[in-house]
């Protein structure tokens, strides 16, 4: 599900009105970059996998000035989840120094850096437009094949497409796996859906998909055609 910018801004205003911090999870947002300042977001969290086409090796935490002030005033009782400490580690490296808190996955981090630079050179706006186009085309394909989207019109994310199904083979991903594609089962909505509720998810992340839209859509279409004929 994709939340429009005006929705995010409204949430931010409501949170700020009671002195809170607005934390937005963008791990599955793909290449839909979020303007933190325009949307009033205090903390944005993401990760190298999915939209960044890298290995899961760290957490990405971007903070507004409000969030930074709040973090610096905290005193954590956790070693691993002490955001203030990790912020100090990052600041040490940004200033050309070195600091140690735990052994880091250096090779994976270096690869992540390379992919970020590759994406920057390719163009952040360009890859965002391609994310939108790919999502729209895949959703149109699935609609034509008779699948209904879980997300309503206007809230359909282009990075993860979730559709209803009555076929356990689609939910489990077995039918896609038989055609060489990896999908995922949908997660429970936890809003009193019936016991026979079933969905499946198709992730549209990665430069290899976004930079090859025709190939990506064609591969999915061919797989669906073969499943229909089976």
Question: What are these model-predicted stretches?
Answer:
Residues 179-201:
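Conserved PLP cofactor-binding pocket of PLP-dependent enzymes
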Residues 52-140, 144, 208:
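Active-site C-terminal subdomain of aminotransferase-like
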Residues 37-49, 59:
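Conserved active-site segment immediately N-terminal to the catalytic lysine
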Residues 148-179:
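Conserved PLP-binding catalytic core of the aspartate aminotransferase-like
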Residues 22-26, 44-47, 183-185:
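General beta-strand structural signal in soluble alpha/beta enzymes
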Residues 194-230:
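PLP-dependent enzyme catalytic core of the Aspartate aminotransferase-like
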Residues 1-18, 32-34, 213:
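Active-site core of PLP-dependent enzymes with the aminotransferase class I/II
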């Amino acid at each position: 599900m994709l939340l429009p910018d005006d929705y995010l801004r409204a949430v931010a205003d409501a949170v700020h009105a009671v002195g809170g911090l607005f934390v937005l999870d963008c791990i599955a947002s793909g290449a839909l970059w979020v303007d933190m300042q325009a949307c009033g977001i205090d903390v944005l969290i993401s990760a190298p996998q999915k939209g960044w086409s890298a290995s899961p090796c760290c957490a990405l935490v971007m903070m507004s000035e409000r969030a930074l002030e709040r973090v610096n005033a905290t005193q954590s009782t956790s070693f691993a989840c002490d955001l203030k400490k990790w912020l100090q580690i990052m600041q040490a490296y940004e200033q050309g120094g070195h600091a140690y808190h735990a052994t880091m996955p250096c090779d994976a981090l270096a690869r992540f850096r390379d992919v970020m630079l590759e994406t920057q050179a390719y163009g952040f706006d360009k890859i965002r437009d391609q994310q939108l186009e790919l999502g729209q085309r895949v959703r149109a394909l699935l609609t034509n094949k008779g699948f209904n989207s879980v997300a309503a019109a206007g809230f359909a994310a282009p990075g993860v497409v979730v559709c209803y199904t009555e076929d356990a083979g689609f939910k489990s991903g077995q039918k896609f796996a038989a055609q060489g594609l990896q999908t995922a089962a949908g997660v429970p909505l936890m809003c009193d859906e019936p016991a026979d509720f079933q969905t499946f998810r198709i992730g549209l992340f990665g430069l290899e998909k976004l930079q090859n839209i025709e190939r990506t859509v064609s591969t999915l279409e061919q797989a669906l055609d073969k499943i229909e004929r089976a």
